[in-house]
């Protein structure tokens, strides 16, 4: 069955706007779980712009579903991950100038270093995922460094979908879906788990959820935005419904 990992970074973004104690990401994680989330994702950035170290510690203690820690492949972050031992650590590129992650990790350019990072995480019992663009070379490099999961960056697909007026049949959208599909097939052929995420929302999620090889989608901003009007539990529940409808409930 296709799974939903809910990214709650922007609950912390709202809290940090006032440098106060609410809204509480740990409470958000519990609400997401009650809405049907299969996992919780947070990105502990080097600049600590939203999620803080204490948030990750509390989530590790309180979350009853799997915890996915997005992180840069730095010694500091690897040390934090190894100490807290989330179920999964997803290696992502990171730039202080960016509003959000803008592209996939270039695994090809840093295979040696990333292989060492993956080995350190594996020694701590942590599954490593890499966030990559839908490119065969990056998929193959991910397999070589020992990653067990690849998350394909769906930002280009989401931008094409929006530019096409939400028409899933437009040539540009079909082309982007095909890129994601082919990357997913390569991921599975190499024995890794195929996840996807970035800029997915209630309008564009179904064509991606319909791909037969995809196992998990990570979605954050759209769900947190919808929760302002419906509550987080219902926002998660509706996203999960759309995903399962597209994938077929039995998958």
From Swiss-Prot:
Pathway: Cofactor biosynthesis; pyridoxine 5'-phosphate biosynthesis; pyridoxine 5'-phosphate from D-erythrose 4-phosphate: step 5/5. GO terms for cellular component: cytosol. It comes from the Bacteria. Disulfide bonds: none annotated. Its EC number is 2.6.99.2. 1-deoxy-D-xylulose 5-phosphate binds at residues 9-10, 45, 50, 100. It is found in: Cytoplasm. 3-amino-2-oxopropyl phosphate binds at residues 7, 18, 199, 220-221. The active site is at residues 43, 70, 198. Its main location: cytoplasm. SUPFAM superfamilies: Pyridoxine 5'-phosphate synthase. The record marks 151 as: Transition state stabilizer. GO terms for molecular function: pyridoxine 5'-phosphate synthase activity. It catalyses: 3-amino-2-oxopropyl phosphate + 1-deoxy-D-xylulose 5-phosphate = pyridoxine 5'-phosphate + phosphate + 2 H2O + H(+). Coiled coil: none annotated. Keywords: Cytoplasm, Pyridoxine biosynthesis, Transferase. It is an enzyme of class 2 (transferase). GO terms for biological process: pyridoxine biosynthetic process. InterPro entries: Aldolase_TIM (IPR013785), PyrdxlP_synth_PdxJ (IPR004569), Pyridoxine-5'_phos_synth (IPR036130). Belongs to the PNP synthase family. PANTHER family: PYRIDOXINE 5'-PHOSPHATE SYNTHASE. Homooctamer; tetramer of dimers. NCBIfam families: pdxJ (TIGR00559), PRK05265.1-3 (NF003625), PRK05265.1-5 (NF003627). Catalyzes the complicated ring closure reaction between the two acyclic compounds 1-deoxy-D-xylulose-5-phosphate (DXP) and 3-amino-2-oxopropyl phosphate (1-amino-acetone-3-phosphate or AAP) to form pyridoxine 5'-phosphate (PNP) and inorganic phosphate. This is Pyridoxine 5'-phosphate synthase. It comes from Aromatoleum aromaticum (strain DSM 19018 / LMG 30748 / EbN1) (Azoarcus sp. (strain EbN1)). The lineage of its organism: Bacteria, Pseudomonadati, Pseudomonadota, Betaproteobacteria, Rhodocyclales.
């Amino acid at each position: 069955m296709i799974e939903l990992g809910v990214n709650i970074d922007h609950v912390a973004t709202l809290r940090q706007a006032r440098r106060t104690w609410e809204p509480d990401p740990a409470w958000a994680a519990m609400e997401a779980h009650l809405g049907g989330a299969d996992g919780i994702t947070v990105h502990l950035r080097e600049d600590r712009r939203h999620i803080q170290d204490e948030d990750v510690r509390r989530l590790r203690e309180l979350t009853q579903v799997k915890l996915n820690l997005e992180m840069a492949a730095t010694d500091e972050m690897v040390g934090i991950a190894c100490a807290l031992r989330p179920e999964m650590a997803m290696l992502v590129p990171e730039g202080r100038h960016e509003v959000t992650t803008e592209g996939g990790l270039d695994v090809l350019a840093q295979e040696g270093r990333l292989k060492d990072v993956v080995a350190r995480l594996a020694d701590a019992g942590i599954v490593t995922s890499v966030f990559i663009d839908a490119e065969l070379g990056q998929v193959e490099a991910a397999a070589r460094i020992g990653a067990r999961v690849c998350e394909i960056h769906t930002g280009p697909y989401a931008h094409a979908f929006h530019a096409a007026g939400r028409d899933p049949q437009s040539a540009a959208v079909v082309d982007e879906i095909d890129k994601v599909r082919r990357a997913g097939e390569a991921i599975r052929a190499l024995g890794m788990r195929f996840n996807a995420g970035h800029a997915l929302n209630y309008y564009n999620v179904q064509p991606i959820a319909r791909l037969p090889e995809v196992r998990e989608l990570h979605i954050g901003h759209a769900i947190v935005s919808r929760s302002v009007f419906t509550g987080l539990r219902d926002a998660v529940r509706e996203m999960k419904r759309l995903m399962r409808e597209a994938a077929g409930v039995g998958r």
